[in-house]
Protein backbone atom coordinates (compact mmCIF):
# COMPACT_ATOMS: atom_id res chain seq x y z
CA UNK A 1 0.00 0.00 0.00
CA UNK A 2 3.00 2.29 0.23
CA UNK A 3 2.64 5.12 -2.25
CA UNK A 4 -0.78 3.95 -3.45
CA UNK A 5 -3.70 6.34 -3.27
CA UNK A 6 -7.26 6.00 -4.46
CA UNK A 7 -8.99 9.09 -5.89
CA UNK A 8 -12.77 9.18 -6.17
CA UNK A 9 -14.06 10.40 -9.52
CA UNK A 10 -16.94 12.81 -8.76
CA UNK A 11 -18.81 11.80 -11.92
CA UNK A 12 -18.88 8.04 -11.31
CA UNK A 13 -18.45 7.98 -7.54
CA UNK A 14 -15.79 5.26 -7.95
CA UNK A 15 -12.11 5.38 -7.16
CA UNK A 16 -9.09 5.00 -9.41
CA UNK A 17 -5.77 3.67 -8.18
CA UNK A 18 -2.89 6.19 -8.39
CA UNK A 19 -0.44 3.60 -9.73
CA UNK A 20 -1.21 0.28 -11.40
CA UNK A 21 -0.83 -2.81 -9.27
CA UNK A 22 2.46 -4.25 -10.49
CA UNK A 23 2.36 -7.55 -8.69
CA UNK A 24 0.19 -10.37 -7.46
CA UNK A 25 2.55 -10.79 -4.49
CA UNK A 26 0.19 -9.56 -1.77
CA UNK A 27 -2.67 -11.69 -3.04
CA UNK A 28 -0.37 -14.72 -3.25
CA UNK A 29 0.81 -14.24 0.35
CA UNK A 30 -2.82 -14.09 1.53
CA UNK A 31 -3.79 -17.07 -0.65
CA UNK A 32 -1.45 -19.43 1.17
CA UNK A 33 -4.10 -19.52 3.93
CA UNK A 34 -7.17 -17.89 2.39
CA UNK A 35 -7.66 -20.16 -0.62
CA UNK A 36 -8.92 -23.64 -1.24
CA UNK A 37 -5.79 -25.30 -2.54
CA UNK A 38 -3.78 -28.47 -2.97
CA UNK A 39 -0.22 -28.46 -1.68
CA UNK A 40 2.39 -29.21 -4.35
CA UNK A 41 5.54 -28.67 -2.30
CA UNK A 42 6.49 -27.80 1.28
CA UNK A 43 8.39 -24.77 2.48
CA UNK A 44 6.35 -21.86 1.13
CA UNK A 45 7.71 -18.50 2.30
CA UNK A 46 6.00 -15.15 1.90
CA UNK A 47 7.07 -13.61 -1.38
CA UNK A 48 7.71 -16.91 -3.15
CA UNK A 49 5.46 -17.67 -6.14
CA UNK A 50 2.30 -19.29 -4.79
CA UNK A 51 2.00 -21.69 -7.72
CA UNK A 52 5.41 -23.21 -6.94
CA UNK A 53 3.91 -24.60 -3.73
CA UNK A 54 0.11 -24.65 -4.11
CA UNK A 55 -2.52 -25.29 -6.74
CA UNK A 56 -5.47 -23.03 -5.82
CA UNK A 57 -8.97 -24.13 -6.81
CA UNK A 58 -10.63 -21.82 -9.29
CA UNK A 59 -13.96 -22.01 -11.13
CA UNK A 60 -14.76 -25.67 -10.63
CA UNK A 61 -18.16 -27.33 -10.67
CA UNK A 62 -19.46 -27.69 -7.14
CA UNK A 63 -17.42 -24.78 -5.78
CA UNK A 64 -19.36 -21.93 -7.44
CA UNK A 65 -22.93 -21.26 -8.51
CA UNK A 66 -23.61 -20.83 -12.25
CA UNK A 67 -23.34 -17.02 -11.85
CA UNK A 68 -19.89 -17.26 -10.21
CA UNK A 69 -20.93 -16.75 -6.58
CA UNK A 70 -19.29 -19.12 -4.15
CA UNK A 71 -21.22 -22.29 -3.40
CA UNK A 72 -18.74 -24.26 -1.33
CA UNK A 73 -15.96 -23.26 1.04
CA UNK A 74 -13.40 -21.49 -1.18
CA UNK A 75 -11.77 -19.30 1.50
CA UNK A 76 -12.20 -15.93 -0.30
CA UNK A 77 -9.19 -16.02 -2.70
CA UNK A 78 -11.09 -17.68 -5.54
CA UNK A 79 -14.05 -15.33 -5.45
CA UNK A 80 -11.89 -12.22 -5.01
CA UNK A 81 -9.54 -13.23 -7.83
CA UNK A 82 -12.43 -13.21 -10.31
CA UNK A 83 -13.88 -9.88 -9.07
CA UNK A 84 -14.01 -6.50 -10.77
CA UNK A 85 -12.32 -5.08 -7.67
CA UNK A 86 -9.27 -7.28 -8.23
CA UNK A 87 -9.28 -6.31 -11.90
CA UNK A 88 -9.31 -2.61 -10.87
CA UNK A 89 -6.19 -3.11 -8.75
CA UNK A 90 -7.72 -3.56 -5.30
CA UNK A 91 -5.64 -5.72 -2.96
CA UNK A 92 -6.52 -7.50 0.27
CA UNK A 93 -4.75 -4.76 2.25
CA UNK A 94 -6.97 -2.03 0.84
CA UNK A 95 -9.82 -3.32 3.02
CA UNK A 96 -8.15 -5.59 5.60
CA UNK A 97 -5.36 -5.06 8.10
CA UNK A 98 -2.86 -7.73 7.04
CA UNK A 99 -1.99 -9.01 10.52
CA UNK A 100 -5.36 -9.51 12.12
CA UNK A 101 -9.04 -9.85 11.47
CA UNK A 102 -9.83 -6.14 11.46
CA UNK A 103 -11.07 -4.10 8.55
CA UNK A 104 -9.47 -0.74 7.83
CA UNK A 105 -12.81 0.94 8.65
CA UNK A 106 -16.13 -0.06 10.22
CA UNK A 107 -19.33 -0.89 8.32
CA UNK A 108 -19.92 0.96 5.07
CA UNK A 109 -16.92 3.19 5.77
CA UNK A 110 -14.62 0.46 4.45
CA UNK A 111 -16.40 0.70 1.09
CA UNK A 112 -16.53 4.51 1.25
CA UNK A 113 -12.73 4.54 1.07
CA UNK A 114 -13.22 4.06 -2.69
CA UNK A 115 -16.94 4.63 -3.35
CA UNK A 116 -18.59 8.02 -2.79
CA UNK A 117 -20.92 7.76 0.22
CA UNK A 118 -23.28 10.38 -1.18
CA UNK A 119 -23.93 8.16 -4.19
CA UNK A 120 -23.71 4.64 -2.78
CA UNK A 121 -24.54 4.87 0.93
CA UNK A 122 -27.98 6.29 0.18
CA UNK A 123 -31.51 4.85 -0.07
CA UNK A 124 -31.55 5.80 -3.77
CA UNK A 125 -28.81 3.18 -4.27
CA UNK A 126 -29.55 0.43 -1.76
CA UNK A 127 -33.36 0.89 -1.44
CA UNK A 128 -33.32 0.33 2.34
CA UNK A 129 -33.70 2.63 5.37
CA UNK A 130 -30.37 4.12 6.47
CA UNK A 131 -28.74 2.11 9.24
CA UNK A 132 -30.75 -1.03 8.51
CA UNK A 133 -29.10 -4.38 7.70
CA UNK A 134 -30.21 -3.99 4.07
CA UNK A 135 -28.30 -0.71 3.84
CA UNK A 136 -24.99 -2.44 4.68
CA UNK A 137 -22.92 -2.81 1.49
CA UNK A 138 -21.69 -6.29 2.44
CA UNK A 139 -25.19 -7.71 2.77
CA UNK A 140 -25.80 -7.32 -0.98
CA UNK A 141 -22.31 -7.30 -2.48
CA UNK A 142 -20.67 -9.88 -0.18
CA UNK A 143 -23.35 -12.35 0.93
CA UNK A 144 -22.35 -14.61 3.82
CA UNK A 145 -22.48 -18.39 3.99
CA UNK A 146 -22.01 -20.20 7.28
CA UNK A 147 -19.75 -23.25 7.24
CA UNK A 148 -19.51 -25.89 9.97
CA UNK A 149 -22.46 -24.20 11.75
CA UNK A 150 -20.24 -21.53 13.37
CA UNK A 151 -18.05 -20.02 10.64
CA UNK A 152 -19.76 -17.31 8.54
CA UNK A 153 -17.69 -16.17 5.55
CA UNK A 154 -18.46 -13.52 2.98
CA UNK A 155 -18.19 -14.02 -0.76
CA UNK A 156 -15.38 -11.74 -1.93
CA UNK A 157 -16.63 -11.61 -5.54
CA UNK A 158 -18.12 -8.17 -4.71
CA UNK A 159 -20.79 -8.56 -7.36
CA UNK A 160 -23.65 -6.31 -8.32
CA UNK A 161 -26.79 -8.18 -7.21
CA UNK A 162 -28.65 -9.63 -10.20
CA UNK A 163 -31.95 -11.10 -8.94
CA UNK A 164 -33.03 -11.96 -12.49
CA UNK A 165 -29.94 -14.20 -12.86
CA UNK A 166 -30.66 -15.88 -9.54
CA UNK A 167 -34.18 -16.66 -10.75
CA UNK A 168 -33.02 -17.86 -14.16
CA UNK A 169 -30.04 -19.92 -12.98
CA UNK A 170 -31.31 -21.12 -9.61
Show which residues each predicted segment covers.
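Primarily the internal scaffold of c-type cytochrome electron-transfer domains
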Residues: 1-170
Amino acid sequence: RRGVHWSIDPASGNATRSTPRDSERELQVCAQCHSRRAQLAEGYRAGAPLHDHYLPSTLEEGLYHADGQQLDEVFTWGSFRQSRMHEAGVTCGDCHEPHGQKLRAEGNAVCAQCHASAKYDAPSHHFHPMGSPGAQCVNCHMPATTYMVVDPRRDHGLRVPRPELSLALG
